[in-house]
């Protein structure tokens, strides 16, 4: 495991953020991550890409990533510089796609307690999220080591290529 902590500013979104809100279908004529990144979350917050900085963290309500099974959604988030997504629950297919693309996501039932603009730190190894703004510490079930290895490698394809190369 390489990167144990993720530190960033929080951007809040509500529940049931579907993949079309993450990256609208009108932009799916490309699969170039940098192009997708320009439009991430555009229909939920048209100014999101302009406001956020690389390394920031999305904290959302339940059922994040519902809707279609498009892999473009986690690709766009990651390419835009979103360091992680925290929500009480994730749509099943988005959950798997996020790890396959190397985007860390964490299930936290108390995510509603974290406000937009808060500075937080996610300790992936110990399963804690520390809200540096409010000094509250939250526990989550750490992701399995294999899933952390996918994140460390930058996604499933990179992980597989590294395995083939013997790294």
UniProtKB/Swiss-Prot annotation:
Q: Which Gene3D superfamilies match?
A: Aconitase, domain 4 (3.20.19.10)
Q: State the superkingdom.
A: Bacteria
CDD domains reported in the protein's UniProt record: IPMI_Swivel
One GO BP annotation here? L-leucine biosynthetic process
Q: Which Enzyme Commission number(s) are on file for it?
A: 4.2.1.33
Q: What is the reaction catalyzed?
A: (2R,3S)-3-isopropylmalate = (2S)-2-isopropylmalate
The pathway where this protein functions is: Amino-acid biosynthesis; L-leucine biosynthesis; L-leucine from 3-methyl-2-oxobutanoate: step 2/4
Which is an annotated GO molecular function term of this record? 3-isopropylmalate dehydratase activity
Q: Name one Pfam family in it.
A: Aconitase_C
> Keyword set for this entry?
Amino-acid biosynthesis, Branched-chain amino acid biosynthesis, Leucine biosynthesis, Lyase
NCBIfam families tied to this protein = LEUD_arch (TIGR02087)
Q: How does it assemble?
A: Heterodimer of LeuC and LeuD.
Q: What does this protein do?
A: Catalyzes the isomerization between 2-isopropylmalate and 3-isopropylmalate, via the formation of 2-isopropylmaleate.
This chain belongs to the protein called 3-isopropylmalate dehydratase small subunit
- The species this protein was found in: Sulfurimonas denitrificans (strain ATCC 33889 / DSM 1251) (Thiomicrospira denitrificans (strain ATCC 33889 / DSM 1251))
Give the organism's phylogenetic lineage.
Bacteria, Pseudomonadati, Campylobacterota, Epsilonproteobacteria, Campylobacterales
């Amino acid at each position: 495991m390489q990167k144990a902590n993720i530190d960033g500013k929080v951007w809040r979104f509500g529940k049931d953020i579907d993949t079309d809100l993450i990256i609208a279908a009108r932009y799916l004529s490309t699969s170039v991550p940098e192009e997708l990144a320009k439009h991430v979350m555009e229909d939920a917050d048209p100014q999101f890409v302009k406001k956020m900085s690389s390394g920031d963290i999305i904290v959302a309500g339940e059922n994040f990533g519902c809707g279609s099974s498009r892999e473009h959604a986690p690709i766009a988030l990651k390419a835009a510089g979103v360091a992680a997504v925290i929500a009480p629950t994730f749509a099943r297919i988005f959950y798997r796609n996020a790890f396959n693309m190397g985007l860390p996501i964490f299930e936290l039932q108390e995510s509603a307690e974290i406000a937009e603009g808060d500075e937080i730190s996610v300790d992936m190894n110990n399963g804690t999220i520390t809200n540096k703004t409010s000094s509250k510490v939250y526990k989550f079930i750490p992701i399995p080591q294999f899933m952390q290895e996918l994140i460390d490698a930058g996604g499933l394809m990179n992980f597989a290529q590294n395995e083939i190369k013997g790294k």
